[in-house]
Structure formats: structure tokens, C-alpha cells
Swiss-Prot record:
Residues with site note (Essential for RT p66/p51 heterodimerization): 992, 1005
Site (Cleavage): 130-131, 361-362, 374-375, 429-430, 437-438, 492-493, 591-592, 1031-1032, 1151-1152
Residues covered by region (Interaction with host AP3D1): 12-19
Residues of the Peptidase A2 domain: 512-581
Residue ranges annotated as motif Tryptophan repeat motif: 989-1005
Short sequence motif Nuclear localization signal: positions: 26-32
Source domain of life: Viruses
Protein name (database record): Gag-Pol polyprotein
Lipidation (N-myristoyl glycine): 2
Organism from which the protein derives: Human immunodeficiency virus type 1 group M subtype C (isolate ETH2220) (HIV-1)
Residues in Integrase catalytic domain copies: 1205-1355
Length: 1439
């Protein structure tokens, strides 16, 4: 105790002991109070030494003050003691504790005011557009969301109807909002009830997930602490506004507003997908669809996609070709990657028809004939053959000069221990039992997967074979099934595919080295002279068509085995032995299905699999499909199924590129509609500017990607398809997929998510290797030397192969430049692939579109590219083939772009150790260019911006939009924002920013003097100019005649009115301002009542698409000072009223709205919503909306939306709510929103049962839905339900059919009670008034009825429906015998559907017919027991 007595000494201790504990009390502070405070501080984990100084006391006060409201008496006493001690330290004279607290409060207020004054100068730097702000006392208070924001939100939903633009608009409008604000926004949406219900379901699901992940902590909440928010708290249903503010501003904060907004955005995404159901991935060209129609559909869907322009450009470049039908795709790929849209459309005209095929054949014949003539002149000497290395496979050097690491073993036979020159075999022994380059035993598949994927004995044997991917050769003496059983398993000779299967073949007496390629249909050899006749042919090759000579019945000897078939001779990069020869040798290639864990897939809720009949197919297509499916079955990709699978999807076949082979296609459109939605795991493509510089680079491509990933076993049954037989000779053969099918919407996202799982085991032990993966394209980089780099590349390929993924050699790029994702990569730089701008005398719309696309693609590395003038040529609805005349500006722009593209430009790679800088230049004509760089003159990437955004704008506003685009792009590519260098002076920026700080966000930036600089051309005054003439301006126009007037009246007696034609109200308002500026001096005050005109001019535009606005801008620039103000119209303001009468004369229609006063009276009494007033008093909606907007009691929250949950007519929800310490029992009719409510004396079962019986006596109640409260689970309520025949159900948390309706009605009822509480003395009276207002004075929801009208309508409709059903059931007891036309024989019996005066409607089997009464006999159906010999139709005739 003595130790802490040293806190105060001498004079301070005397002053301490003179202070009274309470005003007017006798007790004074003593030394023991200091000792007590010392001990209490230790309880609260605060340092007692802080009591020694005034600064320490101030810190303690700051720490304790927030907990005072919820703290104990001891905490309050401790705070009072420390506050008094602070005054003693500061030598502030006080008499008692209350004075000390008052002094502390005064000091805090002064400090707060100083802080706010100091921050006033910097107010422009931080956005204040948040609903939660700090008041003068330092407390966080809530500013309700403004009506202007709500109006903007409602307008967006009404105009856009949940198109993709709704989500960013919602995000912007709800910045910083609390859950209560967000609910207000959602409640203002009047229509779109289905969408709102979807949103509500999503919120409920997310809230339940939140509760699962954040369980409630056991035990009570500690003093001074907030409880943790539950899911329903975040959604604003069970939390108060004060709790929401406390969570959002606490330490640490819980951003409940942001969390709730994220849930809403998830729901909005689902709604947007529902309203825009067609994805760009679903746009595919039909087999016979013209290419032009397909392109029209493609670009129409592309506009609705939620993607950046770069991604849309990529979609155009890749998906347009990828989703074309095979005939068009063959031609499009032959055109190359840089083909324009016009070239594509021209090339694809009439594709597939006989005329097209004749043209192709004629061209091929002429080419071959020319070649033949040339060969005769040169005595058949072929081109000199380039030398080729045996070791690495490259041309240009021999194996002894090869620098690549030497292959192990003999290059001919594959055995180790000798080299090729010492090899005795001189021929590749690929058919021996011992494997070349044996790699050891690879992983084996689990037996379950083998059974699922390989139904036949033969395929099971292959799936369990030692190698992951192998070529099997069936010997001439294959085992019988019995023999196989005796020996245990078949043991065919195998060739591993760890290296390329190159063999030596003998053809036409010549030895050649060739590649065994099971992926090739045909056998293709490089230039070789073969005997016999040949015919010309074109086949699809790498990069386009290859012209070849076709020789038939050619004998090829492969390792002692002979095969006879067709051989094609032409300029192939490698000799290929295709399937036409390999099948004769009995070879098959086994692709195992990857052992990746399958992704579970389901159908959409409430949907079943597709049951689409197979359409007829020609005999040749059936044969082709049968062969393809047998091969796929052997490889385990599909399995046979029986009749127990009820699902089916149509299958068909189309010719491949060379038009000799067939390709199987499955029409998965119906399955795609029924399959669950997937989230695209990868939302964009990687950009080379974001790549870090690497010493060594390799680019790989994954082959047979989809067919290597297994499909969820539970979902496989839905992929069933049938191969029919000709003339239904035999039952169709049924299959289902075991792997991801081509054309199914789940294949891309599942493959995207599977690849990272496969690459992760390789990435972890190889951190020095960087892998960029987009779908099946792989970029692999490292800082290793090229020799060291290639070793892990081979490891990666082997790793992928073990998982069932191949990396074909033909797409394995080892040397620069690397072609990747449309770019060209070099070791230290990158660029876009070469771009050639076409030279044309006449340009079509299609030409300009392709030209702009090329320039946009080039602009990411070529600085200064402009397309604005070219884009202007495309305005308006024009056909693709329309001729466009280039304007002088467009020709100049095109010429400038040609000059820019003449010199190749490269970008460098990103260095994380250096700063990222973005510099912007203004190009004029609303066009901007920018560069990202880390070192001067070494650009990472460039770009352009040419979006105006609004009709009236200025350069500063555009500059902010450019900065935001750049910041977003930078975050996507590099994960951070750059330092900006902007062509605008700080003074200019500050002048605009002072008034428009809320318009946008600007990061850190510095001024760069790059002309032309951005500047403001004029500024408006903030206050009226004294001694200057004031112009009151106004305009009016008639909607029907389009005749209007504009003019002004001045405070000095001047006036001017001009008549206008073909105008609108908005134009006349602007015309009036222009007249005032024109007729005034260098300084002027202008007063308008047009918010539209005021908004345009206050934004200080310096350019506009409107001629009138441009004239106003010119006048403003010429003035020295201008003050512009707004006053509300029709409020009796002097000058405004005078000019209004002048311009309205003969223009505006005068409306005598007698109901306005009555509507205002009604609203003051009942606070009716605007729909009810508009309906009852027959006044335009704008008037009641204004009445509601002006009522302070109706601005608490948006209107409640009724009838969102569609339930049966007999369901009611009951709940108890509390107000003013009393209990209100509320019952809500779910289907209509009708309310019954009463104040009950106690929350007991007896009172609840009595209320329930009263309710059942007034309305038909079949089911009641309650929570699990003790009064609802009581025996009294159960007895009342039993007696009245009511079924009782209890609520389930977060179930939309649970207590959601009554919970929302509780809030609505309390809101109405708050509006009318002053009119009633007792709460029970106010409750009944509120029930009356809700049921009969509020309209909205289903049908636009009030709740009272709606419940009556629903019950009446229910009675009518039941009555109608009874009549239908009665009428179905009759049967009809009838005669048809002149046929004398009676037919029947048929079902009676309807009986009229002159005719009856009957159903005979599946046909519905109308029969005249005179030709029909109606009898009652008495069943089989009455069907005796005497039961004749005529005797039972009811007519």
C-alpha cells in the first residue's frame, strides 16, 4: 500500500483529499482510493504506473470509456477515480467527481473539434461517402442511405433487368453500407419477385454456412465485449443498427456490411446467369448452319459476356474458330491465326457443298500437274534432302557434331552396352519381349477403377499392364480364352512410349525411318518415288493443308511383318505410319484414365437426365460410329450399358479434315441445360508482361486432355448414347462415358481444376521451375542453363504421363521464339505475333471490324495506336458487307497506325525488385495512351483508352477513368498498383477534386510535363456575385406537338422568350441557359429549376455530343465569372414563377389533381404507400411518391415486399415479438401477407391457444408454422390444433419456407406502429391501427393488391379451383361411344372431357376430338361387374 501512496505528494495530495466523492456529499477522496484503483487496474490488465502522470491517466480514460455503457459499477467507479486524478495532475480546480467528468468531456470535445478542423483541408483526399461517420463526441453514428442512391439502384434494375451491369452498379452504390442499408436497397426493388426469391435463398445458404464455420462460443459474453455475429445478424434480420455499427467499427472490426454484400453479389451472379442463360461457350456452329449465321449469333452473345475487352478479343480469336463445324474449322485453320473476319466469311461461303469440293479438287489437280511438269524438266530429281541428327532429331547437323546430351543405349535397337555402329541387328527390334529403355514398373490402377473403366477382359488386362502408356502388338499366335485363364493373364509384346516409337520400314525396296503414330489416320511419307499410278489429294497438316500424292495397294514391311494399304507422299516433317497400316499388324495404343480424384457432379435441382431420342443415321455413319466406339471401349473411355439406363443423348458423325475419316460428335445441349452450373476456375488468360525473365523456357501442350480425366461415377449414366442399326436390324448398342466428354459444359472447369492437383507434386520439389498453365497450354521457365533445364522438363513430361497426360512432340517448343497464347516470346523480350494491316481500295463494315480488332491487339505493346475515328465509321445498324467510305480523319489515323506498326516493338519481362510505373499521355479526341515500365524506354506493356462514358465530359473526368482502368489491369497482371505519372498539374487537379472527390478513387501520383496537359477551361462561382444581373431561366415543351418555349426574366425587368420546334423539355431548359449567357455581360448569376441542366453544367464539361451544350461551354469559357443556382419549381419563388408562366403559356397542359389534398390527408393518418394512394385517388404515381418522400416517418426504410413465398392458401406463420415491454402475438397468412395481431398479457400456451382458436374462427387455417418457443410447444396449443383440425409444423433455421415471412412482418408491423404511435394512447390500440393499415392501406406484391384483397382473392380462387376439380372428377366417370363421319360403326368407349350444348369433347387414346351431340352416346362407367351381355351402350344413354 505504501508503495502506491507515492502517486500523489505534497500539494497534489492535499488537493486530492479536498475533492468530494459526490456533489453535496460529506465523503472525500482518500489515499485508500488510490490503492484500490491500483489493484483494479491490474484486474483489467492495465499498467498501474500510468496513474503517476496525467498522460498515463489520459490513456486509461481512453481505454475504459468505450466500455462504460455495458460495464459494471466497479468499472464506472474506477473511471471516475482516474478522471478525478487526471484533474489533480493537471491542476484543474474541481470540487467533486461530477465536475471532473464535465472537465474531461469539455477537453475531449475541444480535441475532437481541432481534429476535424485539421482534417478539413484534407477532406478531398479520403472518400466520405460512407453511411457510418464520427460525430462531435467521437461516437460512430449512422447516416441513412439517401433517396438519391435508392432511386439510382431502382432505375438500374428497371432498365437493365439484371443484366451483367447490375453487379458493378450495386457494388458502387452500396460502398460502406450496413446490412440495414443493403436490406433497404433490396426492399426497394418492386418487381422481379422470382429473382428476389433466388437472392433470398442464396443469403439463407450463406448465412447457414457462416454459422457452421463460426460456432457460438460457450459461456456468457465478457463485460465490455460484443457478441459474435450470427448469420442472421449479418443479414440484418436479428441484429440492431447499433450492433451492426459496433461490429463494423470495433477493434478488431467484423465487416458485417461487406460480408453481407458479398452474399448478395453471389446471389446476383446467379440471377444474372438466369436472365442471360446463353454462354459464349455454348455458341457452336451446327453441321449445316451457314458460317455467317453462326458469326451473327457468336457476336450477339459475346456482347452480353461479363469479361474485359482483352478477354473478349481472345474469345473472338480462339472460340470463333474452335466452335465452328469441322468443315469450316478446316478452312479457318488453314487461313492461319491472323485471318480477318472478312477472309473467314469469304472462305467459308458454300463450304461442304458439291461446288466447294469441286473447286478444291480442281485446284489440287492443277497444282499437282504443274509439279509433274517441273519434275520432268529436272529429270525427276527431288529436292536435296537435309541431313538429320540421330541423337536429337534436329536437321542441319550430324549426330557426331550434336551438342545435346547423348541418348542412352543404341540408337537403333535401344539396348544398352553398345552404340549404333556396333549394332548387329541393324534394325529396331520393337517386337521382342524385353523392352527397350525399360523404366521399371509404373503405378497400377485400383481394381475398382479398372472395372469401371475397362469392362472387357481384354481391356482389363491392358489397364493393369506394367507401363502407363504403351503400344501393344498382338502376335500371330494369340492365346485362346481358356489358355489365358490357365496362364493367368495375356502377355502381349509391348513397346513403351517413354520415347518416340521410331522404326525402320521397307517400302518400294527402300529403307526409311518412320514414326508409329496411332493418332494419325493415314500413312504419310516424305518425298519418295513409288511405282504405280497416283492421284492428287489434300490432307490437313500442321499449320494448314498439305498437297500429297495417293498411292494405293502399296506393300510396307515393318520388322518382318507386311501390310498392304494406301500411302500418301508429300512434304511431311516426319514419316508417319498411321492406323490404316497399324491395325493390320494388330497394334493398339492404350491411354489409361488418370487416377485423379473425380469431381462430384449433380444435375440441377428438380431436373432429370436427358431423354432425347436418337435420330436416324445413314449406313456409312453407323459403321463409322461403331468402329470409333469399339476403339474407345477398348481404351476404357466408354463402357457398354444395358436397358436399365433410361437416359439418352443423340450422337452423329461428321467427316474429318481430309473428308475420308469420320469424327464422332455427341449433342450434349440437353444435358448441358440440366447439369449444375460450374464456376470457371481460371477467369482470364495470363499475360507475358507479367512473366519474370527466365534463362530457359519451354512451351508444352497437353494432348487428349479431356479423355484423360475420369468422370464422376454417379454422373456417368446421364452421358448415355445409342448407336442405332440400319433398318432396326438389331437393337442399338448403348454406351456411357467414363471420362470427360467433348462438348459437355463441365469438361473445361473440371479439367482446369484437375491440372493444378497434378502439377502440385511436381511444383513442390522444383520451386525453381515456374509453370503457367492455361487449359492445356503450359509455359515452363527457369533460371537454369539450357542443358540443366531440359532434365526437369523431361521429368515433368514423365510426371504428366504417369497421370495419363501426354505432351506431343509436335507441340513441344524447345527453342525461341516460342508461340504462346497468341504471343511471341524471346529470352529477354516478348511481342505480339506479326500483324499485317490490309491495303484496300474499298472497305466493308466487316473489314473495319477486323482492322480495329488487330489494332486493339497490337496496342498492348505498340504505343500510340488510335482507333476512335475508325470506330466512328461503324456507328449505326449496318450489314457486315456494307461499303464504308473512310473519312479524312480515319485515313489519317490509319496511316499513323501503319507507321507505328512498321518498326517491330518488343516488351520486356517483369522484375519484382523494381518499382512499377504507369505513365499516361493525352492524344486528343478523347483518346489516351499509357505505358507500364520499370526502366525508361523499356516498356512492359502499353495500352490505349478511348471510352467517353457520358455525353458531356471533361479531360479530368476521363483521366480518372483511365487511371482506374490501368490500376485494375495492373492488379490483375502484377498484383499491385503502379506509381502513376499524369499530365495534369496539382492545382488543376485540386480545383476539380474539391467538388468531385466522391466521383472516383485516385492512387498516389506525380505530375509529368508531357503536352498536351489536362486543364479545366472554366470554373463556376460558389456564391452569388454581388451587384450583377440575375437571370431566372426556364423552358417547356409539349410532348405531342414537340413545340416549346425557352426564355428568361431578370431582376432588372428584362425578359426574353423564344419559340422552338422539334424540341423536348430538357432541350428547352438548356436553350434558356444559353440565351441567358448570350444576353448577359462578362459576369452573371443564373437561376434554373432544372436538375438535369444543373447537373450537366456543374460537372464542368469541356466537350459534348450535344450542340446546345457545346454552345453553352463556349459561352462559359468566354465569361469572367458565372454563378449557377437551382430552385425547386412551382414553389412560388418570384422570378422563377414569372418565367414559368411565360414559357408555359400554350405549351403545358394544366392538370386539376383534386385528389392530392385527400391523398395527403390519408397519408398523414394511415401512412399509406404510394401504390395505394395512386389507386384510390386516381393520381399520377409521381405525386404519391413525392408525398411519401416528404414524410419523415416513412423514410426509415424501404417498403416491404409481400408475397415473395408462394405457399398453399391454408398456411399461417405465428410468432411472438416484443415492443415497449409487452408481447405481441402475430399471425401471417403466408400466401397473401395478411396479418392478425394482438397484445397478449403473457407468453403462455393458454393465451396462444385462445388466439389460435379466434384465428381459426375467422379464416380457414390448415397448417400453422411456429418456432420452438415454450408457448407454441405447450399442450394447450396442441389440444387447440387437434380440436380445430390444424397441422402444426416447427421452424427450421434458414429454411425459406420457415419463419422468414413472419419475421419480416414483425419488422414491418413495428415500423407502422412507430408511424402511428402518437395517435394512440395504448399500445394495443396502435397495434390494431397498424394491422388495419397493413392489410388495407398498403398495396404491392402479387397482383398489386392490398393484403386484405389478396387473401380474399386467394381463398375464393381456392374454392373455385376445388369446385372445378370436383366437376372434372364427376365428368370423368362417363364414357362416350361415338360415330365418325359417315362410318356407321360405333367407336369407343372414349373419355368425356367436356359436355356442351351442341357437342362434346372426348379423348380416344391420345387423340382429342370434338363430336356433335347427335353422334355421341354418353354412359356412366359402372365398372367391369356391370359389363354383362345386356349392358348395351344405347340403354344407358344419358341424352
Amino acid at each position: 500500500m505504501g508503495a502506491r501512496a507515492s502517486i500523489l505528494r505534497g500539494e497534489k495530495l492535499d488537493a486530492w483529499e479536498k475533492i468530494k466523492l459526490r456533489p453535496g456529499g460529506k465523503k472525500h477522496y482518500m489515499l485508500k482510493h488510490l490503492v484500490w484503483a491500483n489493484r483494479e487496474l491490474e484486474k483489467f490488465a492495465l499498467n498501474p504506473d500510468l496513474l503517476d502522470t496525467s498522460a498515463g491517466c489520459k490513456q486509461i480514460i481512453k481505454q475504459l470509456q468505450p466500455a462504460l455503457q455495458t460495464g459494471t459499477e466497479e468499472l464506472k467507479s474506477l473511471f471516475n477515480t482516474v478522471a478525478t486524478l487526471y484533474c489533480v495532475h493537471q491542476k484543474i480546480e474541481i470540487k467533486d467527481t461530477k465536475e471532473a467528468l464535465d472537465k474531461i468531456e469539455e477537453e475531449q470535445n475541444e480535441s475532437q473539434q481541432k481534429t476535424q478542423q485539421a482534417g478539413a483541408a484534407d477532406r478531398g483526399k479520403d472518400s466520405q461517402n460512407y453511411p457510418i461517420v464520427q460525430n462531435m463526441q467521437g461516437q460512430m453514428v449512422h447516416q441513412p442511405i439517401s433517396a438519391r442512391t435508392l432511386n439510382a439502384w431502382v432505375k438500374v434494375v428497371e432498365e437493365k433487368a439484371f443484366s451483367p451491369e447490375v453487379i458493378p452498379m450495386f457494388t458502387a452504390l452500396s460502398e460502406g453500407a450496413t446490412p440495414q442499408d443493403l436490406n433497404t436497397m433490396l426492399n426497394t426493388v418492386g418487381g422481379h419477385q422470382a429473382a428476389m426469391q433466388m437472392l433470398k435463398d442464396t443469403i439463407n445458404e450463406e448465412a447457414a454456412e457462416w454459422d457452421r464455420l463460426h460456432p457460438v462460443h460457450a459461456g456468457p459474453v465478457a463485460p465490455g465485449q460484443m457478441r459474435d455475429p450470427r448469420g442472421s445478424d449479418i443479414a440484418g434480420t436479428t441484429s440492431t443498427l447499433q450492433e451492426q455499427i459496433a461490429w463494423m467499427t470495433g477493434n478488431p472490426p467484423v465487416p458485417v456490411g461487406d460480408i453481407y454484400k458479398r452474399w448478395i453479389i453471389l446471389g446476383l451472379n446467379k440471377i444474372v446467369r438466369m436472365y442471360s442463360p446463353v454462354s459464349i461457350l455454348d455458341i457452336k456452329q451446327g453441321p449445316k448452319e451457314p458460317f455467317r449465321d453462326y458469326v451473327d449469333r457468336f457476336f450477339k452473345t459475346l456482347r452480353a459476356e461479363q469479361a474485359t475487352q482483352d478477354v473478349k478479343n481472345w474469345m473472338t480469336d480462339t472460340l470463333l474458330v474452335q466452335n465452328a463445324n469441322p468443315d469450316c474449322k478446316t478452312i479457318l485453320r488453314a487461313l492461319g491465326p491472323g485471318a480477318s473476319l472478312e477472309e473467314m466469311m469469304t472462305a467459308c461461303q458454300g463450304v461442304g457443298g458439291p461446288a466447294h469440293k469441286a473447286r478444291v479438287l480442281a485446284e489440287a489437280m492443277s497444282q499437282v500437274n504443274n509439279t509433274t511438269i517441273m519434275m520432268q524438266k529436272s529429270n525427276f530429281k527431288g529436292p536435296k534432302r537435309a541431313i538429320k541428327c540421330f541423337n536429337c532429331g534436329k536437321e542441319g547437323h550430324l549426330a557426331r557434331n550434336c551438342r545435346a546430351p547423348r541418348k542412352k543405349g543404341c540408337w537403333k535397337c535401344g539396348k544398352e552396352g553398345h552404340q549404333m555402329k556396333d549394332c548387329t541387328e541393324r534394325q529396331a527390334n520393337f517386337f521382342r519381349e524385353t523392352l527397350a529403355f525399360q523404366q521399371g514398373k509404373a503405378r497400377e490402377f485400383p481394381s475398382e477403377q479398372t472395372r469401371a473403366n475397362s469392362p472387357t477382359r481384354e481391356s482389363q488386362t491392358r489397364a493393369n499392364s506394367p507401363t502407363t502408356r504403351e503400344l501393344q502388338v498382338r502376335g500371330s499366335n494369340t492365346f485362346s480364352e481358356a489358355g489365358a485363364e490357365r496362364q493367368g493373364s495375356l502377355n502381349f509384346p509391348q513397346i513403351t512410349l517413354w520415347q518416340r516409337p521410331l522404326v525402320t520400314i521397307k517400302i518400294g525396296g527402300q529403307l526409311k525411318e518412320a514414326l508409329l503414330d496411332t493418332g494419325a489416320d493415314d500413312t504419310v511419307l516424305e518425298e519418295i518415288n513409288l511405282p504405280g499410278k497416283w492421284k492428287p489429294k489434300m490432307i490437313g497438316g500442321i499449320g494448314g493443308f498439305i498437297k500429297v500424292r495417293q498411292y494405293d495397294q502399296i506393300i510396307i514391311e515393318i520388322c518382318g511383318k507386311k501390310a498392304i494399304g494406301t500411302v500418301l507422299v508429300g512434304p511431311t516433317p516426319v514419316n508417319i505410319i498411321g492406323r490404316n497400316m497399324l491395325t493390320q499388324l494388330g497394334r493398339t495404343l492404350n491411354f489409361p484414365i488418370s487416377p485423379i480424384e473425380t469431381v462430384p457432379v449433380k444435375l440441377k435441382p428438380g431436373m432429370d437426365g436427358p431423354k432425347v431420342k436418337q435420330w436416324p443415321l445413314t449406313e456409312e455413319k453407323i459403321k463409322a460410329l461403331t468402329a470409333i466406339c469399339e476403339e474407345m471401349e477398348q481404351e476404357g473411355k466408354i463402357s457398354r450399358i444395358g436397358p436399365e439406363n433410361p437416359y439418352n443423348t443423340p450422337v452423329f458423325a461428321i467427316k474429318k479434315k481430309d473428308s475420308t475419316k469420320w469424327r464422332k460428335l455427341v449433342d450434349f445441349r440437353e444435358l448441358n441445360k440440366r447439369t449444375q452450373d460450374f464456376w470457371e476456375v481460371q477467369l482470364g488468360i495470363p499475360h507475358p508482361a507479367g512473366l519474370k525473365k527466365k534463362k530457359s523456357v519451354t512451351v508444352l501442350d497437353v494432348g487428349d486432355a479431356y479423355f484423360s480425366v475420369p468422370l464422376d461415377e454417379g454422373f456417368r449414366k446421364y452421358t448415355a448414347f445409342t448407336i442405332p442399326s440400319t433398318n432396326n436390324e438389331t437393337p442399338g448398342i448403348r454406351y456411357q462415358y467414363n471420362v470427360l466428354p467433348q462438348g459437355w459444359k463441365g469438361s473445361p472447369p473440371i479439367f482446369q481444376s484437375s491440372m493444378p492437383q497434378i502439377l502440385e507434386p511436381f511444383r513442390a520439389p522444383n520451386p525453381e521451375i515456374v509453370i503457367y498453365q492455361y487449359m492445356d497450354d503450359l509455359y515452363v521457365g527457369s533460371d537454369l542453363e539450357i542443358g540443366q533445364h531440359r532434365a526437369p522438363i523431361e521429368e515433368l513430361r514423365e510426371h504428366l504421363l504417369k497421370w495419363g497426360f501426354t505432351t506431343p512432340d509436335k507441340k513441344h517448343q524447345k527453342e525461341p521464339p516460342f508461340l504462346w497464347m497468341g504471343y511471341e516470346l524471346h529470352p529477354d523480350k516478348w511481342t505480339v505475333q506479326p500483324i499485317q494491316l490490309p491495303e484496300k481500295d474499298s472497305w466493308t463494315v466487316n473489314d473495319i471490324q477486323k482492322l480495329v480488332g488487330k489494332l486493339n491487339w497490337a496496342s498492348q505493346i505498340y504505343p500510340g495506336i488510335k482507333v476512335r475515328q475508325l470506330c466512328k465509321l461503324l456507328r449505326g445498324a449496318k450489314a457486315l458487307t456494307d461499303i464504308v467510305t473512310l473519312t479524312e480523319e480515319a485515313e489519317l489515323e490509319l496511316a499513323e497506325n501503319r507507321e507505328i506498326l512498321k518498326e517491330p516493338v518488343h516488351g520486356v519481362f517483369y522484375d519484382p525488385s523494381k518499382d512499377l510505373i504507369a505513365e499516361i499521355q493525352k492524344q486528343g479526341n478523347d483518346q489516351w495512351t499509357f505505358q507500364f515500365y520499370q526502366e525508361p524506354f523499356k516498356n512492359l506493356k502499353t495500352g490505349k483508352f478511348a471510352k467517353r462514358g457520358t455525353a458531356h465530359t471533361n479531360d479530368v473526368k476521363q483521366l480518372t477513368a483511365v487511371v482506374q482502368k490501368i490500376a485494375l489491369e495492373s492488379i490483375v497482371i502484377w498484383g499491385k498498383t503502379p506509381k502513376f505519372r499524369l499530365p495534369i498539374q496539382k492545382e488543376t487537379w485540386e480545383a476539380w477534386w474539391t467538388d468531385y472527390w466522391q466521383a472516383t478513387w485516385i492512387p498516389e501520383w506525380e505530375f509529368v510535363n508531357t503536352p498536351p496537359l489536362v486543364k479545366l477551361w472554366y470554373q463556376l462561382e460558389k456564391e452569388p456575385i454581388a451587384g450583377v444581373e440575375t437571370f431566372y431561366v426556364d423552358g417547356a415543351a409539349n410532348r405531342e406537338t414537340k413545340i416549346g418555349k425557352a426564355g428568361y426574366v431578370t431582376d432588372r425587368g428584362r425578359q426574353k422568350i423564344v419559340s422552338l420546334t422539334e424540341t423536348t423539355n430538357q432541350k428547352t431548359e438548356l436553350q434558356a441557359i444559353q440565351l441567358a449567357l448570350q444576353d448577359s455581360g462578362s459576369e452573371v448569376n443564373i437561376v434554373t429549376d432544372s436538375q438535369y441542366a444543373l447537373g450537366i453544367i456543374l460537372a464542368q464539361p469541356d466537350k459534348s455530343e450535344s450542340e446546345i451544350v457545346n454552345q453553352i461551354i463556349e459561352q462559359l469559357i468566354s465569361k469572367e465569372r458565372v454563378y449557377l443556382s437551382w430552385v425547386p419549381a412551382h414553389k412560388g419563388i418570384g422570378g422563377n414563377e414569372q418565367v414559368d408562366k411565360l414559357v408555359s403559356s400554350g405549351i403545358r397542359k394544366v392538370l386539376f389533381l383534386d385528389g392530392i389534398d385527400k391523398a395527403q390527408e390519408e397519408h398523414e393518418k394511415y401512412h399509406s404507400n404510394w401504390r395505394a394512394m395512386a389507386n384510390e385517388f386516381n393520381i399520377p404515381p409521381v405525386v404519391p411518391k413525392e408525398i411519401v418522400a416528404c414524410c419523415d416517418k416513412c423514410q426509415l426504410k424501404g417498403e416491404a415486399i409481400h408475397g415473395q413465398v408462394n405457399c398453399s392458401p391454408g398456411i399461417w406463420q405465428l410468432d411472438c415479438t416484443h415492443l415497449e415491454g409487452k408481447i405481441i402475438l402475430v399471425a401471417v397468412h403466408v400466401a397473401s401477407g395478411y396479418i392478425e395481431a394482438e397484445v397478449i398479457p403473457a407468453e403462455t400456451g393458454q393465451e396462444t391457444a385462445y388466439f389460435l382458436l379466434k384465428l381459426a374462427g375467422r379464416w380457414p387455417v390448415r397448417v400453422i408454422h411456429t418456432d420452438n418457443g415454450s408457448n407454441f410447444t405447450s399442450n394447450a396449443v396442441k389440444a387447440a390444433c387437434w380440436w380445430a383440425g390444424i397441422q402444426q409444423e416447427f421452424g427450421i433455421p434458414y429454411n425459406p419456407q420457415s419463419q422468414g415471412v413472419v419475421e419480416s412482418m414483425n419488422k414491418e408491423l413495428k415500423k407502422i406502429i412507430g408511424q402511428v404511435r402518437e395517435q394512440a394512447e395504448h399500445l394495443k390500440t396502435a397495434v390494431q391501427m397498424a394491422v388495419f393499415i397493413h392489410n388495407f392501406k398498403r398495396r404491392g406484391g402479387i397482383g398489386g393488391y392490398s393484403a386484405g384483397e389478396r387473401i380474399i382473392d386467394i381463398i375464393a380462387s381456392d374454392i373455385q379451383t376445388k369446385e372445378l376439380q370436383n366437376q372434372i372428377l364427376k365428368i370423368q366417370n362417363f364414357r362416350v361411344y361415338y360415330r365418325d363421319s359417315r362410318d356407321p360403326i360405333w367407336k369407343g368407349p372414349a373419355k368425356l372431357l367436356w359436355k356442351g350444348e351442341g357437342a362434346v369433347v372426348i379423348q380416344d387414346n391420345s387423340d382429342i376430338k370434338v363430336v356433335p351431340r347427335r353422334k355421341a352416346k354418353i354412359i356412366r362407367d359402372y365398372g367391369k361387374q356391370m359389363a354383362g351381355a345386356d349392358c348395351v351402350a344405347g340403354r344407358q344413354d344419358e341424352d
